[in-house]
Amino acid sequence: MDLDAVRTFVAVAAAGQFSEAAAELGVSQQAVSKRVAALEKDLGVALFTRTPRGADLTVDGQAFLPPARDLLRAEERAAASVRPGRRALRVDVISTRIAPARLLHGFHQAQPGTPLEVVRLFDAGTAIEAVRTGAIDASFRAVTLPARQLPDGIVTTRVLDEPVQLLTGPGHALAAAGSVTPAQLAGHRIWMPALVPGTEWTAFYDEFAAAFGLSVEVTGPNFGTEPLLDVLAGSSELASLVGEQTHLVWPAGFDLRRVRLRDPVPVYPHSLIWRAGNAHPALGELRDHLAATRPDRRDAGLWTPEWAGA
């Protein structure tokens, strides 16, 4: 079985779109389509139902997804097992658009000679298990579990408190505000279709919404970042929430606005997760770099979820 085709299938399943999977994998959309078609031919079943706006898993696709992920993890472990001491440091950043990727890129710029492999895993449970088994060396995550509930040998440390911002189109009532308080968001429609039950980012925004009496809508399929920006640009009612360091690019005509939140400033708590006893020399270098470059946000005007701790 072609593992590149399996990897492509998993990417499309996660993104819900061939185009977004192509961007994540760094290949053309045509290459993604060919790989999926070859895999479907090899398996003798259709894995996706194509629609004008994306791709939905068929029943067979849903059945194939868990073992496909297991297969890729097994491949990762096999490759790592034959490169002790010489292999690249493997770090999960969730997505290349968000703050963890910037943190890792900053380390790469400071240590350009250190081999790195950027990994993108979906949920914290998968990431922690990958760290535990040695499939990856580290992961950037918001850690919702207390230390006593983490697997033996798993270590975490806070590396970034990232301010959350309001994202609106030019016609929104808050678009012209230089900053607003979380309480001022009450009554406004906040749309975040990427929130998935059970994920750490959903836990963060659920608690944030509850703390300030906000209503967060998750309706509609998640077609990715670009369709979200398109909707916000043309809406006078919908807004969304994003991290300050989330990398977003939109056409000039969209005129989207990023509005700071204050009094208090909600911050998303990014932590680095690794396994005690991991002797990869670059892991220690990464930890030292993150400690030395962590912004000082010791401010009473910050808000974090109760599970985030200090």
Give the predicted meaning of each segment.
Residues Q29-Q30, R73-A130, F140-R141:
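N-terminal winged-helix
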Residues L229, E244-R257, D263-A310:
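C-terminal effector-binding regulatory domain of bacterial HTH transcription factors
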Residues S28, R35:
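Residues within the DNA-recognition helix of helix-turn-helix
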Residues A124, R132-A135, A194-R257:
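Hydrophobic hinge/microswitch elements
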Residues V12-G26:
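Short helix-boundary/capping micro-motifs
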Residues A38-L57:
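A short LG(V/I)-centered, amphipathic sequence patch enriched
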